[in-house]
A protein has these predicted regions:
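Short, solvent-exposed loop/turn elements at domain surfaces
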Residues: 40, 271-273, 319-322
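Bacterial N-terminal signal peptides
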Residues: 8-17
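Solvent-exposed loop/turn segments at secondary-structure junctions
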Residues: 35-37, 63-66, 102-106, 134-136, ...
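Bacterial N-terminal signal peptides that target proteins for export
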Residues: 1-8
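Metal-dependent de-N-acetylase/amidase catalytic core
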Residues: 2, 20-31, 109-284
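Gly-Asp-aromatic-enriched flexible segments
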Residues: 78, 283-403
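Active-site rim/loop-helix segments in enzyme catalytic domains that contact anionic ligands
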Residues: 20-123, 153-157
Length: 403
Protein backbone atom coordinates (compact mmCIF):
# COMPACT_ATOMS: atom_id res chain seq x y z
CA UNK A 1 0.00 0.00 0.00
CA UNK A 2 1.13 3.53 -0.69
CA UNK A 3 1.45 5.61 2.46
CA UNK A 4 1.05 9.38 2.43
CA UNK A 5 3.41 11.48 4.48
CA UNK A 6 2.27 12.23 8.00
CA UNK A 7 1.75 15.89 7.17
CA UNK A 8 1.57 16.78 3.50
CA UNK A 9 0.15 20.01 2.17
CA UNK A 10 -0.05 21.08 -1.46
CA UNK A 11 -0.31 24.80 -1.91
CA UNK A 12 -1.26 26.36 -5.21
CA UNK A 13 -0.36 29.99 -5.88
CA UNK A 14 -2.19 31.29 -8.90
CA UNK A 15 -3.64 34.29 -10.62
CA UNK A 16 -6.05 34.94 -13.44
CA UNK A 17 -5.49 34.13 -16.20
CA UNK A 18 -3.89 30.88 -15.07
CA UNK A 19 -0.90 29.86 -17.16
CA UNK A 20 -0.82 26.37 -15.69
CA UNK A 21 2.73 25.60 -16.82
CA UNK A 22 4.53 23.24 -14.48
CA UNK A 23 8.25 22.85 -14.01
CA UNK A 24 8.02 19.69 -16.13
CA UNK A 25 4.82 18.89 -17.99
CA UNK A 26 3.30 15.49 -17.45
CA UNK A 27 2.15 13.46 -20.45
CA UNK A 28 -1.09 11.72 -19.55
CA UNK A 29 -3.18 9.23 -21.53
CA UNK A 30 -6.68 7.94 -20.87
CA UNK A 31 -7.55 4.80 -22.88
CA UNK A 32 -11.09 3.43 -23.02
CA UNK A 33 -13.54 1.62 -25.29
CA UNK A 34 -16.07 4.21 -26.50
CA UNK A 35 -16.10 7.97 -27.14
CA UNK A 36 -17.49 9.54 -23.91
CA UNK A 37 -15.98 7.11 -21.37
CA UNK A 38 -12.86 9.15 -20.70
CA UNK A 39 -15.19 12.02 -19.87
CA UNK A 40 -17.43 9.90 -17.61
CA UNK A 41 -14.76 8.08 -15.62
CA UNK A 42 -11.82 10.50 -15.74
CA UNK A 43 -13.23 13.84 -16.89
CA UNK A 44 -12.61 15.44 -13.52
CA UNK A 45 -8.99 14.45 -13.09
CA UNK A 46 -8.40 15.34 -16.75
CA UNK A 47 -9.75 18.86 -16.17
CA UNK A 48 -7.45 19.20 -13.17
CA UNK A 49 -4.44 18.01 -15.16
CA UNK A 50 -5.05 20.46 -18.01
CA UNK A 51 -5.83 23.25 -15.54
CA UNK A 52 -2.32 22.73 -14.16
CA UNK A 53 -0.86 22.87 -17.66
CA UNK A 54 -0.19 19.17 -18.27
CA UNK A 55 -0.76 17.45 -21.63
CA UNK A 56 -3.59 14.92 -21.84
CA UNK A 57 -4.58 12.60 -24.68
CA UNK A 58 -7.78 10.54 -24.88
CA UNK A 59 -7.84 7.32 -26.91
CA UNK A 60 -11.08 5.47 -27.73
CA UNK A 61 -10.56 1.95 -29.07
CA UNK A 62 -13.90 1.88 -30.93
CA UNK A 63 -15.75 4.48 -32.96
CA UNK A 64 -19.01 4.09 -31.02
CA UNK A 65 -21.02 3.17 -34.12
CA UNK A 66 -23.50 0.94 -32.27
CA UNK A 67 -24.63 3.37 -29.55
CA UNK A 68 -27.95 4.50 -31.00
CA UNK A 69 -31.47 3.22 -31.61
CA UNK A 70 -32.00 4.81 -35.05
CA UNK A 71 -28.82 6.13 -36.68
CA UNK A 72 -26.86 4.03 -39.14
CA UNK A 73 -23.38 2.95 -37.99
CA UNK A 74 -21.36 5.15 -40.35
CA UNK A 75 -23.42 8.26 -39.64
CA UNK A 76 -23.31 7.59 -35.92
CA UNK A 77 -19.53 7.10 -35.93
CA UNK A 78 -19.12 10.45 -37.68
CA UNK A 79 -21.44 12.14 -35.22
CA UNK A 80 -19.73 10.65 -32.20
CA UNK A 81 -16.35 11.77 -33.50
CA UNK A 82 -17.64 15.35 -33.71
CA UNK A 83 -19.01 15.05 -30.17
CA UNK A 84 -15.60 13.82 -29.01
CA UNK A 85 -13.97 16.87 -30.59
CA UNK A 86 -16.34 19.14 -28.66
CA UNK A 87 -15.42 17.36 -25.45
CA UNK A 88 -11.75 17.75 -26.42
CA UNK A 89 -12.16 21.52 -26.45
CA UNK A 90 -14.06 21.59 -23.17
CA UNK A 91 -11.38 19.58 -21.35
CA UNK A 92 -8.47 21.31 -23.15
CA UNK A 93 -7.12 17.99 -24.42
CA UNK A 94 -4.19 18.06 -26.80
CA UNK A 95 -5.39 14.96 -28.63
CA UNK A 96 -8.50 12.77 -28.82
CA UNK A 97 -7.76 9.69 -30.94
CA UNK A 98 -10.68 7.50 -32.03
CA UNK A 99 -9.77 4.16 -33.60
CA UNK A 100 -12.02 2.84 -36.36
CA UNK A 101 -13.06 -0.44 -34.73
CA UNK A 102 -16.74 -1.32 -34.45
CA UNK A 103 -18.62 -0.76 -31.20
CA UNK A 104 -19.76 -3.89 -29.34
CA UNK A 105 -17.36 -6.41 -30.89
CA UNK A 106 -13.93 -5.15 -29.80
CA UNK A 107 -11.33 -7.92 -29.97
CA UNK A 108 -7.94 -8.21 -28.31
CA UNK A 109 -5.83 -8.66 -31.44
CA UNK A 110 -2.14 -8.23 -32.14
CA UNK A 111 -3.00 -5.35 -34.46
CA UNK A 112 -4.79 -3.26 -31.85
CA UNK A 113 -2.22 -4.05 -29.16
CA UNK A 114 0.49 -2.71 -31.46
CA UNK A 115 -1.57 0.43 -32.14
CA UNK A 116 -2.05 1.05 -28.42
CA UNK A 117 1.62 0.45 -27.63
CA UNK A 118 2.62 2.75 -30.48
CA UNK A 119 0.33 5.53 -29.22
CA UNK A 120 1.69 5.22 -25.68
CA UNK A 121 5.24 5.26 -27.03
CA UNK A 122 4.68 8.20 -29.38
CA UNK A 123 2.91 10.21 -26.68
CA UNK A 124 5.77 9.45 -24.27
CA UNK A 125 3.18 8.87 -21.57
CA UNK A 126 4.14 9.26 -17.92
CA UNK A 127 0.84 7.83 -16.71
CA UNK A 128 -1.95 5.91 -18.44
CA UNK A 129 -5.48 5.57 -17.08
CA UNK A 130 -7.51 2.64 -18.39
CA UNK A 131 -10.19 0.10 -17.47
CA UNK A 132 -9.70 -2.68 -14.95
CA UNK A 133 -9.30 -5.90 -17.01
CA UNK A 134 -12.00 -8.05 -15.46
CA UNK A 135 -14.42 -10.64 -16.85
CA UNK A 136 -18.13 -10.16 -17.42
CA UNK A 137 -19.64 -6.72 -17.79
CA UNK A 138 -19.41 -4.83 -21.08
CA UNK A 139 -17.32 -6.77 -23.61
CA UNK A 140 -15.64 -3.69 -25.05
CA UNK A 141 -14.74 -2.15 -21.71
CA UNK A 142 -13.24 -5.32 -20.29
CA UNK A 143 -11.46 -6.07 -23.57
CA UNK A 144 -10.00 -2.55 -23.58
CA UNK A 145 -8.49 -3.23 -20.17
CA UNK A 146 -6.89 -6.45 -21.37
CA UNK A 147 -5.62 -4.81 -24.56
CA UNK A 148 -3.80 -2.08 -22.63
CA UNK A 149 -2.41 -4.56 -20.12
CA UNK A 150 -0.97 -6.79 -22.84
CA UNK A 151 0.18 -3.84 -24.95
CA UNK A 152 2.36 -2.73 -22.04
CA UNK A 153 4.59 -5.77 -22.63
CA UNK A 154 5.54 -4.25 -26.00
CA UNK A 155 7.08 -1.20 -24.33
CA UNK A 156 10.74 -0.95 -23.39
CA UNK A 157 11.52 -0.41 -19.73
CA UNK A 158 12.59 3.19 -20.27
CA UNK A 159 9.28 3.87 -22.06
CA UNK A 160 7.15 2.23 -19.37
CA UNK A 161 4.56 4.56 -17.81
CA UNK A 162 2.60 4.14 -14.62
CA UNK A 163 -0.76 2.47 -15.31
CA UNK A 164 -3.79 3.37 -13.20
CA UNK A 165 -7.16 1.65 -13.30
CA UNK A 166 -10.46 3.46 -13.55
CA UNK A 167 -13.56 1.40 -12.73
CA UNK A 168 -16.47 1.32 -15.17
CA UNK A 169 -20.11 0.71 -14.20
CA UNK A 170 -19.45 -3.06 -13.95
CA UNK A 171 -16.17 -3.19 -12.04
CA UNK A 172 -17.14 -0.31 -9.75
CA UNK A 173 -19.63 -2.71 -8.15
CA UNK A 174 -16.79 -4.99 -6.99
CA UNK A 175 -15.87 -4.84 -3.31
CA UNK A 176 -12.61 -2.93 -3.06
CA UNK A 177 -11.03 0.21 -1.61
CA UNK A 178 -9.51 2.49 -4.28
CA UNK A 179 -5.90 3.56 -3.86
CA UNK A 180 -6.67 7.14 -4.83
CA UNK A 181 -9.72 9.37 -4.66
CA UNK A 182 -9.54 12.76 -6.34
CA UNK A 183 -11.63 15.73 -5.22
CA UNK A 184 -13.17 17.12 -8.42
CA UNK A 185 -15.53 19.68 -6.87
CA UNK A 186 -13.87 22.66 -8.57
CA UNK A 187 -14.11 21.06 -12.04
CA UNK A 188 -17.45 19.28 -11.69
CA UNK A 189 -19.20 21.63 -14.09
CA UNK A 190 -16.41 21.14 -16.63
CA UNK A 191 -16.76 17.37 -16.38
CA UNK A 192 -20.52 17.64 -16.72
CA UNK A 193 -20.16 19.82 -19.82
CA UNK A 194 -17.72 17.37 -21.40
CA UNK A 195 -20.12 14.49 -20.79
CA UNK A 196 -22.94 16.64 -22.15
CA UNK A 197 -21.06 17.13 -25.42
CA UNK A 198 -22.06 13.56 -26.29
CA UNK A 199 -25.68 14.41 -27.07
CA UNK A 200 -26.27 11.20 -29.03
CA UNK A 201 -25.79 9.38 -25.74
CA UNK A 202 -27.08 11.63 -22.95
CA UNK A 203 -30.04 13.15 -24.80
CA UNK A 204 -31.02 10.27 -27.08
CA UNK A 205 -29.59 6.78 -26.55
CA UNK A 206 -29.45 6.58 -22.75
CA UNK A 207 -32.91 8.16 -22.24
CA UNK A 208 -34.27 5.71 -24.82
CA UNK A 209 -32.80 2.78 -22.91
CA UNK A 210 -34.40 4.06 -19.71
CA UNK A 211 -37.78 4.65 -21.34
CA UNK A 212 -37.81 8.44 -20.88
CA UNK A 213 -36.80 9.61 -24.35
CA UNK A 214 -39.91 11.69 -25.05
CA UNK A 215 -39.67 13.51 -21.72
CA UNK A 216 -35.96 14.28 -22.18
CA UNK A 217 -36.36 15.52 -25.75
CA UNK A 218 -39.20 17.81 -24.71
CA UNK A 219 -37.29 19.97 -22.22
CA UNK A 220 -33.81 21.47 -21.88
CA UNK A 221 -34.30 21.47 -18.14
CA UNK A 222 -35.04 17.75 -18.11
CA UNK A 223 -32.04 17.16 -20.39
CA UNK A 224 -29.78 18.89 -17.88
CA UNK A 225 -31.32 16.89 -15.07
CA UNK A 226 -30.84 13.63 -16.97
CA UNK A 227 -27.21 14.51 -17.71
CA UNK A 228 -26.58 15.11 -14.02
CA UNK A 229 -28.19 11.85 -12.94
CA UNK A 230 -26.44 9.97 -15.75
CA UNK A 231 -23.04 11.24 -14.58
CA UNK A 232 -23.33 11.41 -10.80
CA UNK A 233 -23.23 7.62 -10.13
CA UNK A 234 -19.55 7.68 -11.15
CA UNK A 235 -18.71 10.74 -9.07
CA UNK A 236 -20.29 10.20 -5.65
CA UNK A 237 -18.45 9.67 -2.37
CA UNK A 238 -19.22 6.10 -1.34
CA UNK A 239 -17.96 4.72 2.01
CA UNK A 240 -15.04 2.91 0.34
CA UNK A 241 -14.08 6.08 -1.52
CA UNK A 242 -14.33 8.05 1.72
CA UNK A 243 -11.47 5.97 3.13
CA UNK A 244 -9.25 6.86 0.19
CA UNK A 245 -10.20 10.53 0.47
CA UNK A 246 -9.32 10.58 4.15
CA UNK A 247 -6.01 8.87 3.44
CA UNK A 248 -4.80 11.56 1.05
CA UNK A 249 -6.75 14.67 2.09
CA UNK A 250 -7.32 14.11 5.81
CA UNK A 251 -10.65 13.55 7.56
CA UNK A 252 -11.64 17.20 7.84
CA UNK A 253 -10.97 17.98 4.18
CA UNK A 254 -12.64 14.74 3.07
CA UNK A 255 -15.87 15.76 4.80
CA UNK A 256 -16.20 18.73 2.47
CA UNK A 257 -15.86 16.78 -0.80
CA UNK A 258 -19.01 16.39 -2.90
CA UNK A 259 -17.74 15.02 -6.22
CA UNK A 260 -14.93 12.52 -6.60
CA UNK A 261 -13.22 10.13 -8.99
CA UNK A 262 -11.65 6.88 -7.84
CA UNK A 263 -8.56 5.10 -9.15
CA UNK A 264 -6.40 2.10 -8.41
CA UNK A 265 -2.75 1.28 -9.09
CA UNK A 266 -2.36 -1.35 -11.79
CA UNK A 267 -0.17 -4.32 -10.94
CA UNK A 268 1.74 -3.98 -14.21
CA UNK A 269 3.90 -1.21 -15.62
CA UNK A 270 6.09 1.13 -13.59
CA UNK A 271 5.16 1.20 -9.93
CA UNK A 272 4.82 4.46 -8.01
CA UNK A 273 6.80 5.34 -4.93
CA UNK A 274 5.37 7.65 -2.27
CA UNK A 275 7.21 10.54 -3.93
CA UNK A 276 5.79 9.63 -7.34
CA UNK A 277 2.21 9.93 -6.11
CA UNK A 278 2.28 13.69 -5.73
CA UNK A 279 4.43 14.09 -8.84
CA UNK A 280 2.05 12.12 -11.07
CA UNK A 281 -1.15 13.12 -9.27
CA UNK A 282 -0.25 16.75 -8.49
CA UNK A 283 -3.85 17.77 -7.87
CA UNK A 284 -4.26 15.34 -4.98
CA UNK A 285 -4.09 16.50 -1.39
CA UNK A 286 -5.18 19.57 0.49
CA UNK A 287 -5.06 22.53 -1.86
CA UNK A 288 -4.83 26.22 -0.97
CA UNK A 289 -5.18 28.80 -3.71
CA UNK A 290 -3.99 32.38 -3.62
CA UNK A 291 -3.28 34.93 -6.31
CA UNK A 292 0.36 35.27 -7.31
CA UNK A 293 -0.29 38.99 -7.01
CA UNK A 294 -1.00 38.71 -3.31
CA UNK A 295 1.74 39.55 -0.85
CA UNK A 296 1.73 36.45 1.36
CA UNK A 297 0.00 33.08 1.62
CA UNK A 298 -0.85 31.81 5.10
CA UNK A 299 -0.09 28.06 4.97
CA UNK A 300 -1.80 27.40 8.30
CA UNK A 301 1.28 25.48 9.46
CA UNK A 302 2.44 26.36 12.97
CA UNK A 303 6.16 25.69 13.33
CA UNK A 304 8.12 25.19 16.51
CA UNK A 305 11.69 26.37 16.82
CA UNK A 306 14.03 23.65 15.59
CA UNK A 307 11.46 21.86 13.43
CA UNK A 308 12.65 20.66 10.04
CA UNK A 309 10.48 21.03 6.95
CA UNK A 310 11.12 20.19 3.32
CA UNK A 311 9.52 22.26 0.58
CA UNK A 312 9.26 21.29 -3.09
CA UNK A 313 7.84 23.69 -5.65
CA UNK A 314 7.22 23.68 -9.36
CA UNK A 315 5.32 25.77 -11.83
CA UNK A 316 5.93 28.98 -13.72
CA UNK A 317 4.80 32.56 -13.32
CA UNK A 318 4.81 35.58 -15.56
CA UNK A 319 6.62 38.09 -13.36
CA UNK A 320 6.83 40.89 -15.93
CA UNK A 321 3.60 41.34 -17.86
CA UNK A 322 4.90 44.09 -20.13
CA UNK A 323 8.02 42.24 -21.25
CA UNK A 324 6.46 38.74 -21.01
CA UNK A 325 9.18 37.40 -18.73
CA UNK A 326 8.68 34.07 -16.99
CA UNK A 327 10.41 32.29 -14.14
CA UNK A 328 10.20 29.12 -12.08
CA UNK A 329 10.30 28.99 -8.24
CA UNK A 330 14.05 29.70 -8.28
CA UNK A 331 13.27 33.13 -9.73
CA UNK A 332 14.59 35.25 -12.59
CA UNK A 333 18.28 36.07 -12.44
CA UNK A 334 19.66 38.65 -12.83
CA UNK A 335 17.27 41.45 -11.97
CA UNK A 336 18.63 44.95 -11.54
CA UNK A 337 15.62 47.23 -11.35
CA UNK A 338 14.26 48.12 -7.96
CA UNK A 339 15.80 47.33 -4.63
CA UNK A 340 12.92 46.65 -2.31
CA UNK A 341 12.41 42.94 -2.91
CA UNK A 342 11.96 41.00 0.36
CA UNK A 343 15.03 38.80 -0.29
CA UNK A 344 17.85 40.80 -1.86
CA UNK A 345 20.16 38.77 -4.04
CA UNK A 346 17.47 36.22 -4.88
CA UNK A 347 15.78 36.20 -8.25
CA UNK A 348 12.60 38.13 -8.90
CA UNK A 349 9.57 35.87 -8.82
CA UNK A 350 11.30 33.29 -6.62
CA UNK A 351 9.29 31.46 -3.98
CA UNK A 352 10.15 32.86 -0.56
CA UNK A 353 8.97 32.34 3.00
CA UNK A 354 8.79 33.90 6.42
CA UNK A 355 7.80 32.73 9.88
CA UNK A 356 5.23 35.00 11.46
CA UNK A 357 2.66 37.31 9.90
CA UNK A 358 4.60 40.50 10.56
CA UNK A 359 8.09 39.06 10.26
CA UNK A 360 10.65 41.10 8.34
CA UNK A 361 13.21 38.32 8.04
CA UNK A 362 12.45 36.39 4.83
CA UNK A 363 14.24 33.47 3.21
CA UNK A 364 14.55 31.95 -0.24
CA UNK A 365 12.76 28.65 -0.85
CA UNK A 366 13.00 28.11 -4.60
CA UNK A 367 12.33 24.69 -6.11
CA UNK A 368 13.68 22.61 -3.24
CA UNK A 369 14.60 23.50 0.30
CA UNK A 370 15.13 21.87 3.66
CA UNK A 371 14.52 24.46 6.34
CA UNK A 372 15.24 24.42 10.06
CA UNK A 373 12.74 26.69 11.78
CA UNK A 374 14.84 29.34 13.49
CA UNK A 375 11.88 30.43 15.60
CA UNK A 376 8.31 29.43 16.39
CA UNK A 377 5.43 30.82 14.37
CA UNK A 378 3.19 30.35 11.36
CA UNK A 379 4.73 29.71 7.96
CA UNK A 380 3.91 32.14 5.14
CA UNK A 381 4.85 31.91 1.46
CA UNK A 382 5.27 34.73 -0.99
CA UNK A 383 6.71 35.90 -4.30
CA UNK A 384 10.04 37.74 -4.34
CA UNK A 385 9.02 40.82 -6.30
CA UNK A 386 8.86 44.53 -5.61
CA UNK A 387 5.60 44.70 -7.58
CA UNK A 388 3.40 41.61 -7.62
CA UNK A 389 0.52 43.33 -9.43
CA UNK A 390 1.78 42.34 -12.88
CA UNK A 391 2.27 38.66 -11.96
CA UNK A 392 0.31 35.82 -13.49
CA UNK A 393 0.57 32.07 -13.21
CA UNK A 394 1.02 29.50 -10.48
CA UNK A 395 3.45 27.64 -8.31
CA UNK A 396 2.59 24.30 -6.78
CA UNK A 397 4.26 23.80 -3.43
CA UNK A 398 4.42 20.67 -1.29
CA UNK A 399 5.42 21.09 2.34
CA UNK A 400 6.41 18.19 4.56
CA UNK A 401 7.00 18.58 8.27
CA UNK A 402 9.76 16.09 9.05
CA UNK A 403 9.98 16.51 12.81
Amino acid sequence: MLNPRIITIIIVILATPVLGISQEKLKVMVIFAHPDEGEIYAGGITALYTQLGHDVKFMSLTNGDAGHYAMKPKELAERRYKEAMRAKEILSLLEYEVLDYHDGILENTEEIRKKVASSIRDWEADVVFTFYPARGGHNDNMTAGWIVREASSLLDEEQMPVFIYMRDFHTASFSYIPDFAINIDEVWETKLAACGAHESQVIEYNPKMEGVLDEVLASKEIQADFLFHNTIPFSIVRPDIRLALEKWYGKEEAKEVTYVEEFEMAEYGRQMTDEDVFELLPMMGKVHKVSARADWLDTGIELSEGQIITIEANGQILWNLKERKYCNPDGAVPYTRGGNKPVLGAGTGALIGRIGEDATQCFLIGKNSKIHAFKSGRLYLGINDDNTQDNEGLYRVRIQVIK
